[in-house]
Amino acid sequence: MSMLFPLHQQLIEQFTIFLSVDRGIAPLSVQAYCQDILLFLQRVPIETTDMINQESVFLFVEKCHQAKESETTLARRLIALKVFFHFLKDAKLIHQQPFIEHPKVWKRLPSILSTEEVNSLLNQPLNTLNLDAYIANRDTAILYTFYATGIRVSELCDLCIGDISDDFIRVTGKGRKTRLVPISIKARQTIDSYLTMFRERFQKKNPSEEHVFLSIRGKKLERSCVWKRITFYAKLVTTKHISPHSLRHAFATHLLNNQADLRIIQEMLGHARISSTEIYTHVASESIIEKFHTHHPRSSS
């Protein structure tokens, strides 16, 4: 284990405040950033801020390679470093920001569920034998909400009663930015059914709880629980590796396949950059090619 200098703890504490207050970054993301920065401070190691320079970046990258870390992991660590160096410069703790060139990382195209697989997944909770009616209806509403809106799992867990209207849900995304996302009639019906017939049963244990989706203890549903529920149902309907994010991918890709505008999809997904949304154009293209080879009589000619 590398030595933890007093400076490390001091910098991490200040960086945490910077990320949380100045940048408005979610707690789990703050934790991930700080873990990467602490690793940098320990691996080099950094004893004073004067040691944070271009050479320290090169040394850190070299040690990451020695640890046989993937390019994706290294890219994530360097993104964290770039934000950290900006914080240090802004706080006048360093005079010059070290230059960081991100390694080239191929974007892995997500595995996309077909519409048939999505339909099977959406219906699975109510078709699962011996499943408590509250759990089944709550999970059905969760699945429909994911697929109808494309929101992230953290955004779903943060939904409150006041965020839901007849046609839209108000979503609080990264950087605490809010956006309005339209919701389908069917998804709204599953939410209404859950709210009127089942949610109250567990809210009695915690009457002041305003979050939409509750655990059996009447508390806000945790991300880990949502992941477990989704993967449980997914294993019953497909051999693909499925997570809550898979429904976000399916939402975007199926919209593109039906000629939806890319900019509108970007807004609904809450992507800051259009490049993050453009990956779905490649997935949609692959889907079109696959259908061509499957159905066109002369595709192999």
From Swiss-Prot:
It comes from Chlamydia muridarum (strain MoPn / Nigg). Keywords: Cell cycle, Cell division, Chromosome partition, Cytoplasm, DNA integration, DNA recombination, DNA-binding. The keyword Cytoplasm applies. PROSITE patterns: CB, TYR_RECOMBINASE. Residues 108-293 form the Tyr recombinase domain. This is Tyrosine recombinase XerD. GO terms for molecular function: DNA binding; tyrosine-based site-specific recombinase activity. It holds the Pfam family Phage_int_SAM_1. The keyword Cell division applies. Forms a cyclic heterotetrameric complex composed of two molecules of XerC and two molecules of XerD.
